[in-house]
Protein backbone atom coordinates (compact mmCIF):
# COMPACT_ATOMS: atom_id res chain seq x y z
CA UNK A 1 0.00 0.00 0.00
CA UNK A 2 1.27 3.48 -0.90
CA UNK A 3 2.38 5.84 1.86
CA UNK A 4 3.22 9.51 1.27
CA UNK A 5 6.26 10.12 3.47
CA UNK A 6 6.47 13.77 2.41
CA UNK A 7 2.89 14.29 3.61
CA UNK A 8 3.73 12.71 6.96
CA UNK A 9 6.83 14.86 7.34
CA UNK A 10 4.76 17.96 6.55
CA UNK A 11 1.62 17.17 8.56
CA UNK A 12 2.71 14.57 11.11
CA UNK A 13 0.25 11.80 10.23
CA UNK A 14 -1.55 9.79 7.55
CA UNK A 15 -4.78 7.76 7.40
CA UNK A 16 -5.39 4.61 5.34
CA UNK A 17 -8.96 3.23 5.44
CA UNK A 18 -9.66 -0.47 4.81
CA UNK A 19 -6.09 -1.55 5.53
CA UNK A 20 -7.11 -4.96 6.89
CA UNK A 21 -9.65 -7.50 5.70
CA UNK A 22 -12.73 -8.26 7.79
CA UNK A 23 -11.22 -11.63 8.68
CA UNK A 24 -7.99 -10.02 9.92
CA UNK A 25 -10.01 -7.53 11.96
CA UNK A 26 -12.05 -10.31 13.56
CA UNK A 27 -8.90 -12.22 14.52
CA UNK A 28 -7.41 -9.13 16.16
CA UNK A 29 -10.65 -8.29 17.96
CA UNK A 30 -10.84 -11.82 19.38
CA UNK A 31 -7.20 -11.71 20.41
CA UNK A 32 -7.68 -8.33 22.09
CA UNK A 33 -10.73 -9.54 24.00
CA UNK A 34 -8.74 -12.50 25.33
CA UNK A 35 -5.50 -10.66 26.09
CA UNK A 36 -4.42 -10.20 29.72
CA UNK A 37 -4.06 -6.68 31.06
CA UNK A 38 -0.48 -5.51 31.50
CA UNK A 39 -1.25 -2.10 33.00
CA UNK A 40 -3.99 0.51 33.08
CA UNK A 41 -5.36 3.61 34.77
CA UNK A 42 -8.16 2.90 37.22
CA UNK A 43 -11.41 4.81 37.59
CA UNK A 44 -11.21 7.76 39.98
CA UNK A 45 -11.85 6.94 43.62
CA UNK A 46 -13.78 9.02 46.15
CA UNK A 47 -10.78 11.32 46.40
CA UNK A 48 -10.92 11.93 42.64
CA UNK A 49 -7.56 10.25 42.07
CA UNK A 50 -6.73 7.44 39.65
CA UNK A 51 -3.98 4.86 39.90
CA UNK A 52 -1.86 2.93 37.43
CA UNK A 53 -2.09 -0.72 38.44
CA UNK A 54 -1.32 -4.03 36.68
CA UNK A 55 -3.31 -7.21 36.16
CA UNK A 56 -6.82 -6.12 37.19
CA UNK A 57 -10.08 -7.00 35.46
CA UNK A 58 -10.40 -4.91 32.27
CA UNK A 59 -13.56 -3.23 33.59
CA UNK A 60 -11.59 -1.83 36.53
CA UNK A 61 -9.85 0.65 34.23
CA UNK A 62 -10.69 3.81 32.34
CA UNK A 63 -8.14 2.62 29.82
CA UNK A 64 -5.68 -0.25 29.75
CA UNK A 65 -3.12 -1.95 27.55
CA UNK A 66 -2.15 -5.55 27.01
CA UNK A 67 1.19 -7.29 27.00
CA UNK A 68 3.04 -7.46 23.68
CA UNK A 69 1.15 -10.02 21.62
CA UNK A 70 3.65 -10.32 18.76
CA UNK A 71 4.01 -14.09 19.19
CA UNK A 72 0.55 -14.53 17.69
CA UNK A 73 0.43 -15.21 13.96
CA UNK A 74 -2.17 -12.54 13.18
CA UNK A 75 -0.06 -9.82 14.83
CA UNK A 76 2.99 -10.89 12.84
CA UNK A 77 0.85 -10.91 9.70
CA UNK A 78 -0.15 -7.29 10.33
CA UNK A 79 3.45 -6.32 11.05
CA UNK A 80 4.52 -7.85 7.74
CA UNK A 81 1.80 -5.87 5.98
CA UNK A 82 3.11 -2.62 7.51
CA UNK A 83 6.80 -3.28 6.76
CA UNK A 84 6.83 -1.86 3.20
CA UNK A 85 5.41 1.44 4.46
CA UNK A 86 7.80 1.61 7.40
CA UNK A 87 10.63 0.86 5.00
CA UNK A 88 9.84 4.07 3.10
CA UNK A 89 9.55 6.14 6.27
CA UNK A 90 12.91 5.00 7.62
CA UNK A 91 14.80 4.34 4.38
CA UNK A 92 15.06 0.69 5.35
CA UNK A 93 16.63 1.31 8.76
CA UNK A 94 13.96 0.46 11.33
CA UNK A 95 12.84 -2.02 13.96
CA UNK A 96 9.25 -3.00 14.63
CA UNK A 97 8.32 -2.96 18.29
CA UNK A 98 5.04 -3.15 20.14
CA UNK A 99 2.11 -5.23 19.03
CA UNK A 100 -0.07 -4.58 22.05
CA UNK A 101 -3.69 -3.53 22.42
CA UNK A 102 -4.94 -0.26 23.90
CA UNK A 103 -8.53 -0.26 25.14
CA UNK A 104 -10.56 2.73 26.34
CA UNK A 105 -13.65 1.75 28.30
CA UNK A 106 -17.03 3.50 27.93
CA UNK A 107 -17.53 6.61 30.10
CA UNK A 108 -13.78 7.21 30.23
CA UNK A 109 -13.00 10.92 30.19
CA UNK A 110 -9.29 10.34 29.65
CA UNK A 111 -7.31 12.84 27.58
CA UNK A 112 -3.56 13.37 27.89
CA UNK A 113 -1.60 15.25 25.23
CA UNK A 114 1.86 13.77 24.77
CA UNK A 115 4.64 12.59 22.44
CA UNK A 116 5.77 8.98 21.99
CA UNK A 117 9.21 7.33 22.05
CA UNK A 118 11.82 8.67 21.52
CA UNK A 119 10.47 12.23 21.62
CA UNK A 120 8.95 11.76 25.07
CA UNK A 121 12.52 11.99 26.38
CA UNK A 122 14.03 15.45 26.89
CA UNK A 123 16.97 14.40 24.69
CA UNK A 124 14.72 14.45 21.59
CA UNK A 125 11.68 16.43 22.78
CA UNK A 126 12.45 19.31 20.42
CA UNK A 127 14.53 17.47 17.83
CA UNK A 128 13.40 18.62 14.39
CA UNK A 129 15.92 16.67 12.33
CA UNK A 130 14.96 15.41 8.88
CA UNK A 131 15.29 11.75 9.88
CA UNK A 132 12.17 10.22 11.43
CA UNK A 133 13.28 8.57 14.65
CA UNK A 134 9.93 7.11 15.68
CA UNK A 135 6.60 6.29 14.01
CA UNK A 136 3.43 4.79 15.42
CA UNK A 137 1.14 2.64 13.30
CA UNK A 138 -2.33 2.09 14.77
CA UNK A 139 -5.08 -0.29 13.67
CA UNK A 140 -8.64 0.68 14.61
CA UNK A 141 -10.52 -2.38 15.86
CA UNK A 142 -13.74 -0.45 16.45
CA UNK A 143 -15.26 2.58 14.80
CA UNK A 144 -13.00 5.56 15.50
CA UNK A 145 -14.72 8.94 15.76
CA UNK A 146 -15.46 11.72 18.23
CA UNK A 147 -18.03 9.54 20.01
CA UNK A 148 -15.86 6.48 20.62
CA UNK A 149 -12.76 8.46 21.57
CA UNK A 150 -10.74 7.83 18.44
CA UNK A 151 -7.13 8.95 18.68
CA UNK A 152 -6.77 12.69 18.08
CA UNK A 153 -3.62 14.38 16.75
CA UNK A 154 -2.53 17.99 16.30
CA UNK A 155 -1.36 18.36 12.68
CA UNK A 156 2.01 20.04 12.28
CA UNK A 157 2.79 19.93 16.00
CA UNK A 158 5.86 17.80 15.30
CA UNK A 159 7.49 20.93 13.83
CA UNK A 160 6.74 23.29 16.72
CA UNK A 161 8.39 23.72 20.11
CA UNK A 162 6.44 22.23 23.00
CA UNK A 163 7.53 21.28 26.49
CA UNK A 164 6.38 18.21 28.40
CA UNK A 165 5.71 20.12 31.60
CA UNK A 166 3.33 22.43 29.72
CA UNK A 167 1.49 19.49 28.15
CA UNK A 168 1.28 17.78 31.54
CA UNK A 169 -0.22 20.96 32.99
CA UNK A 170 -2.85 21.08 30.24
CA UNK A 171 -1.58 24.36 28.81
CA UNK A 172 -2.05 23.14 25.23
CA UNK A 173 -5.41 21.42 25.71
CA UNK A 174 -7.40 24.31 24.24
CA UNK A 175 -5.21 24.41 21.13
CA UNK A 176 -5.38 20.62 20.85
CA UNK A 177 -9.17 20.54 21.03
CA UNK A 178 -9.56 23.50 18.68
CA UNK A 179 -7.07 22.53 15.98
CA UNK A 180 -6.69 18.78 16.41
CA UNK A 181 -8.04 16.10 14.07
CA UNK A 182 -9.72 12.86 15.12
CA UNK A 183 -8.64 9.72 13.29
CA UNK A 184 -12.03 8.76 11.84
CA UNK A 185 -11.91 5.14 10.70
CA UNK A 186 -13.98 2.00 10.43
CA UNK A 187 -12.58 -1.22 11.96
CA UNK A 188 -9.52 -2.31 10.00
CA UNK A 189 -8.46 1.21 9.09
CA UNK A 190 -4.87 2.26 9.74
CA UNK A 191 -3.44 5.56 10.90
CA UNK A 192 0.18 6.44 11.45
CA UNK A 193 1.89 9.43 12.96
CA UNK A 194 5.34 10.83 13.57
CA UNK A 195 6.07 10.06 17.23
CA UNK A 196 6.77 13.76 17.88
CA UNK A 197 3.19 14.67 16.87
CA UNK A 198 1.07 15.73 19.84
CA UNK A 199 -1.76 13.23 20.27
CA UNK A 200 -4.13 11.68 22.78
CA UNK A 201 -6.74 9.05 23.36
CA UNK A 202 -10.05 10.86 23.78
CA UNK A 203 -13.14 10.37 26.01
CA UNK A 204 -15.25 7.36 25.05
CA UNK A 205 -18.96 8.22 24.89
CA UNK A 206 -19.97 5.23 22.74
CA UNK A 207 -21.23 2.85 25.42
CA UNK A 208 -18.74 0.11 24.52
CA UNK A 209 -14.95 -0.39 24.68
CA UNK A 210 -12.87 1.22 21.95
CA UNK A 211 -10.04 -1.12 20.86
CA UNK A 212 -6.77 -0.33 19.10
CA UNK A 213 -3.62 -2.22 18.17
CA UNK A 214 -0.50 -0.07 18.27
CA UNK A 215 2.89 -0.82 16.72
CA UNK A 216 5.88 1.39 17.43
CA UNK A 217 8.63 1.61 14.79
CA UNK A 218 12.04 3.06 15.64
CA UNK A 219 14.97 4.24 13.54
CA UNK A 220 17.67 1.59 13.78
CA UNK A 221 20.75 3.81 13.66
CA UNK A 222 23.25 2.22 16.13
CA UNK A 223 24.28 5.49 17.80
CA UNK A 224 20.69 6.61 18.22
CA UNK A 225 19.60 3.25 19.65
CA UNK A 226 22.47 3.28 22.14
CA UNK A 227 21.50 6.80 23.26
CA UNK A 228 17.85 5.74 23.52
CA UNK A 229 18.77 2.72 25.63
CA UNK A 230 20.63 5.04 27.99
CA UNK A 231 17.62 7.35 28.28
CA UNK A 232 15.21 4.45 28.82
CA UNK A 233 17.39 3.10 31.62
CA UNK A 234 16.83 6.34 33.56
CA UNK A 235 13.05 5.86 33.64
Question: What does each of the following model-derived ranges do?
Answer:
Residues 131-134, 144-202, 219-222, 233-234:
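Double-stranded beta-helix
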Residues 16, 139, 191-193:
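Short hydrophobic-aromatic micro-motifs
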Amino acid sequence: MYIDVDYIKANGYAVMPNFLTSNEVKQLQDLCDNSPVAMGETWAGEDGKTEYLPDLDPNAYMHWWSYNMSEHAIVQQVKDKIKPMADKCFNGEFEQLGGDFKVTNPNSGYMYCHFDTPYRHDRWANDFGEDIKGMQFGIALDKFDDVSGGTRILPGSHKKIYHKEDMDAGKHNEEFLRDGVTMELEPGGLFCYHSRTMHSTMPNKSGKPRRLMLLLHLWNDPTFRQELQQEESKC
